[in-house]
Structure formats: structure tokens, C-alpha cells
Amino acid sequence: MLKAKRILIAAGGTGGHINPALSVAGYIRSQDPTAEILFVGTADKMEAKLVPQAGYPIKMIDISGFRRDLSPAGIVHNIKTVSKMFKSSSQAKKIIEDFKPELAIGFGGYVSGPVIRMAAKLGVPTAIHEQNAYPGVTNKTLAKQVDAVMLTSMAAEKYLEPKNPCMLTGLPVRAEFFTADKARSRLELGVDSRPLILSSGGSLGAEPINRAMVELIAARAPKGDCCFIHATGHSGTWVTDELKKRGVDPDKFENVTIREYIDDMSRCMAACDLFINRAGASTLSEIEALGKPSILIPSPYVAENHQYHNAMTLVEKNAAVVIEEKDLTGEKLTEEVEKLLSDRAGLDKMGENARAMCVSDAAQRIYDCLCKVVG
């Protein structure tokens, strides 16, 4: 059992950092219900809502990242960021001195920097978890100072200079991604025996993906030989009207379902034969858990282009195909889909390769690593 009774967790900015942190916090609590867990985040990011919703207390510090443009606004922002760096270190020190943690864990995001750095300086055992195949700036710096570096993919190791050897732990995935059954999921969704293509433009609705999917659905749906579930995202509500203009009315085509969001992702992914999506770390871990072949379209708008590096870990194992957004067209996507669907054995092999990459006991591995850190 983890000897630490008071655990400080720093995670923020995006769900990609926060959700793994919440998963690990939940696992720690499952092993020791008396453990005191305190999160540290920033007031204007997702953690301010997600962490309290999950039932954990959270303290806030004032921190932001640097902008890379040299516009007047960018320069002003960066000057303020330097000021916040000094302020956030003082805030982190006070939180640590008040809470007196016996272990501090960073899951990425700018907030992890001052918190984990200060914890290490004050002699608190420390660990970080890197979700992506290309580490963020914060974790690159912290790796030199912390007691343990945990990785989702060993591809990240070559970009780090850790004080101690890195440990492969994988990324925690919700249990339903391991238990969802394909036949039952298809029955619940009303999908017959035809191949099902599941796709998403992300929560906001990436226009290049939505436009390419309109082309693909317009080309393939009238043939009636496959089914589609596509999530447009918040800004993609135009997709249905565009499909209607092209002669594909989702209300009249029983093989086409258009949603704004997919809130039953484990069921839809279990049911599908091919998944088209971005390449965030959590998404890839879910793909691996369910063993699904995929076409990945990495977001070019993320730090260090890390989604491309994430995607390439699957491509190198013949578990996925990558189309960069700059190369994405409806024609190219349609061509790739038709090529994959025409080779069922090859498609199944891609899924098997994805499943072989899965670290199914990620939460346990992280917990075991933390036990070693505390001693």
C-alpha cells in the first residue's frame, strides 16, 4: 500500500492532463479510502470545474504559458507570464507548507511546473506522468528534478534527461473501454452487419475533418454498403445541411447518423469497424483498449505537434493510418477508407496490432511506481 497519506496532484489546462490525474486519484482512494488528496490547478481552466465535480478539493495558483508570437499582444502576455512565474512559485510554496504532502505528482499543464518544482525543492517525494509521445516543455524541465518519470509511451524517453530511469505505465482508461462488447453495442445502436465508420471532428468541431467527412459520406452512403456515425462538434452544425444539399439527408438514410457530440464513446467505438479522429493521448489509449483500426488526423494546433508524434507510435506498429491536416481532402480520406475496407484481413490485423499496444493495468502500474517513490 502507498505509504503516503497526503498526496498533492498538479494537473491542468486540458482534459488530457486532468482526466488521467482523476483516474489515478480514484485508484489511490480505492486502495486507501483515508488518503487525503489535494489538487492544484488554475481558476480559468477545465480543472476548476472537473476536479470539484469528481469530489476532490482544489487550490488555485496563477500561471500561464508563454506565447510564441512577437506581436505587441504576445509580448505583453509574455511579460505578464514572467511576473506570474514568480507569484505562482510563492503560491505553490504556501500550498505545500499548509498541506504538508508526503507525495507530489504532476500530470502536465503549466500548473505542474511551479508546484512540482517547489515540492522537490522542499524535499517532498515527486513524480510526473507524461501522456504524449513528445513531452511538453513543463515535463521536459521537471524530468531532471523529480524522483520518477512515468510514460504513456516509451517514444517520449529520447526527448527527456531524467534523474532516474523512465518507467512505462501507460495511460489509465475507463473500465468500460475494456468491457464494451461489439455485438451488444451494435444492437443497442441499431447497426446491422455492414461496416460501421465512426468519426469525430472533436468537441469544438474541426472544420477540415467535418468537410472531409461530408465528402466521404456523400460518396459512400448512397451505395448502402457501410454505415456512418459522425460527431460534428459544436461548430459543425452546418454538416447536416451540407449533406442534404449533396442528396444525403441523414433523416432519410438509415445508414447515416449525425450527432453534435458522442457521449457514449465506449459503446460507439466498440461497435465500429474503423475510427477516424484526432490523436490525443487519451483517444489513442481508448483505441488500443478496444483494438480498433483507425485513421488519425493529428491536430496541428497543439504544443510541440505532439499529436503527430502520438499517432506515429501506432503507425510504426501498423495499427493506424495518419493523414496530416495539411494533406486532408475528402478525396484522400475516401480513398484511404475504401482501401482499408477492401482488405478485411488487413483491417482486422490493424486492430490486433492496436490492442497489442494496450497497457491494460496502467493505473496499477502508476500506483506501484508511486509506492516505490515514497519507499
List each model region and its residues.
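A short, well-ordered alpha-helix in the C-terminal region of glycosyltransferases
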Residues: 346-360
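Conserved nucleotide-sugar phosphate-binding/catalytic loop shared by glycosyltransferases and other
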Residues: 4-14, 31-87, 169, 201, ...
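C-terminal alpha-helical cap of glycosyltransferases
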Residues: 359-375
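Glycosyltransferases and closely related glycan-assembly transferases
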Residues: 91-104, 111-127, 140, 144
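Active-site-proximal region of nucleotide-activated glycan assembly enzymes
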Residues: 38, 46, 57, 120-182
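Donor-nucleotide binding loops and adjacent catalytic segments primarily
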Residues: 50, 182-275, 308-312, 316, ...
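Structural loop-to-beta junction motif characteristic of Rossmann-like glycosyltransferase folds
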Residues: 56, 124-125, 273-274, 291-299, ...
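Acidic donor-binding loop of glycosyltransferase active sites
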Residues: 101-103, 266-284, 292
